[in-house]
Design a protein with these regions (language model features):
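Transmembrane alpha-helical segments that form the membrane-embedded catalytic/substrate-channel core
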Residues: 60-73
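Structural signal for membrane-spanning alpha-helices in multi-pass inner-membrane proteins
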Residues: 42-45, 68, 97
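Membrane-proximal soluble regions of multi-pass membrane proteins
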Residues: 2-17, 74-114
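Core segments of transmembrane alpha-helices
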Residues: 30-43
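Transmembrane helix interruption/hinge and helix-loop junction motifs
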Residues: 45-53
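Membrane interfacial helix-start motif at the N-side
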Residues: 11-32
Length: 114
């Protein structure tokens, strides 16, 4: 895995970095809650036509995630350096959590960094 100062070049490399940065279960659960709440809010906005509330989707999603990084994981969110890949990875992680694959991903990444 690359150091914090080196630039990650591929999404596969980034995914391993992302998983390592989300090693604590509470971090993953807080991301899950924020992502799901932002999706529910987005559905409400689309259905109601209240587009002025759109920025709240980002606020809700990122508030839970950033809280987890600063107070649970004690690291800096990857969003600051890799915004697009981080956004995509949040949804990939939620999908893996819903399908029961995320814990295995964490273990795989931990084992590869020994």
């Amino acid at each position: 895995m690359k150091s914090e100062t080196e630039r990650i070049e591929t999404y596969a490399e980034f995914w391993d970095f992302y998983v390592a940065e989300h090693a604590q279960p509470l971090t993953r659960y807080l991301h899950f809650i924020g992502t799901m709440l932002s999706l529910v809010l987005l559905v409400w906005i689309v259905r109601s036509g209240n587009w002025l509330y759109s920025p709240l989707c980002l606020v809700v999603g990122y508030a839970f995630a950033w809280f987890a990084h600063f107070f649970v994981e004690h690291n800096k969110p990857a969003t600051f350096k890799y915004p697009f890949w981080s956004f995509v990875s949040d949804y990939k992680m939620v999908f893996f959590m819903l399908t029961g694959k995320m814990n295995a991903e964490v273990e795989r990444v931990k084992a590869s960094n020994i």
